């Protein structure tokens, strides 16, 4: 069985995000980029399923500019068998919406015919948490979201997911779509030999037009601004002063 894994290139989680001077979006020039952490978990889970014998091939896919190939090479270095790059140069004022990404992944799924599609539950740049659900809807496949455990056999996938007050266990007929939670696994580090091998591997390149997918966005970003800076804290000398400030400044009493 083949597993298709979607990955995304994002600003590294350790980088302090800054807004562009023209306020059209987040500054990405000369900024460290990396694979979305939830996507790393998705790749790791696919590799573990292949190593257990439940799957035979892992195909990584991404949508983005030419630089996104680095993210695919990370997936290849981790152990993915093949990679597909859907080339798309982003427009900050017309970002690629989750529905457009889901349509692209649907087209890839119809081409690759996987038994399972695994995605991170969300990306840390936009936190939409929509693509996996939309993809399942477009494919009319069952879905298991926020997976914290996945057990796969030839015909079904058993998924444990954390819900309010406990753990829910669901059974999905294959093919299916699964989105990963942070608790699912701990991604492996790519070894230096595998990193070097990944650099020489051929990545298949296609465009949304090749897949006959319309990715035009109806949403326009008007402006992006940084959150207001927090005021410095004040040390109060007495309870009376605290009550006075709550009453006259905060006006909560």
Curated annotation (Swiss-Prot):
It is found in: Mitochondrion matrix. PROSITE patterns: ETF_BETA. The keyword Transcription does not apply. It comes from the Eukaryota. Binds 1 FAD per dimer. It holds the Pfam family ETF. Belongs to the ETF beta-subunit/FixA family. This is Electron transfer flavoprotein subunit beta, mitochondrial.
